[in-house]
Amino acid sequence: MNNIIDGKALANEILADLKLEIQELTSQTNASPKLAIVLVGDNPASIIYVRHKIKNAHKVGIYTLLINLSATIHTNDLISKINELNLDNEISGIIVQLPLPSSIDKNKILSAISPSKDIDGFHPLNVGYLHSGISQGFIPCTALGCLAAIKKYEPNLTGKNVVIIGRSNIVGKPLSALLLKENCSVTICHSKTHNLRSITSKADIVVAAIGSPLKLTAEYFNPESIVIDVGINRISSNKIIGDVDFENVQSKVQYITPVPGGIGPMTIAFLLKNTVKAFKDSLYTLDT
């Protein structure tokens, strides 16, 4: 049954276009985009994610600067390092790999990144732009990846009933804003939602982002459902699974993303797309 939304293939299309765009920009400006990645501590999952980001950045011609910092660093010292990157004109975009150690004030750190370099879209100003409907700033990459995956198979979203399970600032909230802009009727569910199955089973599109392995079984969906699984649950050193019971759900829905190979590659593709946007915005700023 060929109903799998191949996030890796979709991401490769985006990366191929980005590579050509960067080559053209470099030939015109004699400059290239550069991404600074701040990694605090030695969280094994974070190290793997950072490696994927660097590998794909190099594929398309984005230079990377990896800054490894001790897990014992103080919040103010980390802010000082971010301020250095904010002032470095060669740096197009900055990301601080999450999660951070509990001793660090995450909100202060994300707010310290210059909004013009905040390619993760987590700065309060960028969050405000998105939820105010202002086409400016940066949008969180996972939300962008989810929307692109959905629109590949359902280009016209007007009037669609969408259920998002999860209310995080990374997926649930930003994706709800994007889908409202597409004229969807959006319901956000979470851990306190009652009768979840009765809500999701009536939806045209279900986005699962709860971090609960194989939580959603076939009974949560209908035959016309488009299922987007954002869950990344590591059950061993070399195996991850999603929030959806893929093996039993796949044959009973219209389309579904796998884990791995679904939204993960799309997230990285849009991170790099945001980096190129930041680079182009900086060129415009320098010209004015």
UniProtKB/Swiss-Prot annotation:
It holds the Pfam family THF_DHG_CYH_C. Its EC number is 1.5.1.5, 3.5.4.9. NADP(+) binds at residues 166-168, 191, 232. CDD domains: NAD_bind_m-THF_DH_Cyclohyd (cd01080). One of its GO terms (molecular function) is methylenetetrahydrofolate dehydrogenase (NADP+) activity. GO terms for cellular component: cytosol. The keyword Membrane does not apply. This is Bifunctional protein FolD. PROSITE patterns: THF_DHG_CYH_1 (PS00766), THF_DHG_CYH_2 (PS00767). Gene3D superfamilies: Leucine Dehydrogenase, chain A, domain 1, NAD(P)-binding Rossmann-like Domain. Homodimer. InterPro entries: Aminoacid_DH-like_N_sf, NAD(P)-bd_dom_sf, THF_DH/CycHdrlase, THF_DH/CycHdrlase_cat_dom, THF_DH/CycHdrlase_CS, THF_DH/CycHdrlase_NAD-bd_dom. Belongs to the tetrahydrofolate dehydrogenase/cyclohydrolase family. SUPFAM superfamilies: Aminoacid dehydrogenase-like, N-terminal domain, NAD(P)-binding Rossmann-fold domains. GO terms for biological process: L-histidine biosynthetic process; methionine biosynthetic process; purine nucleotide biosynthetic process; tetrahydrofolate interconversion.
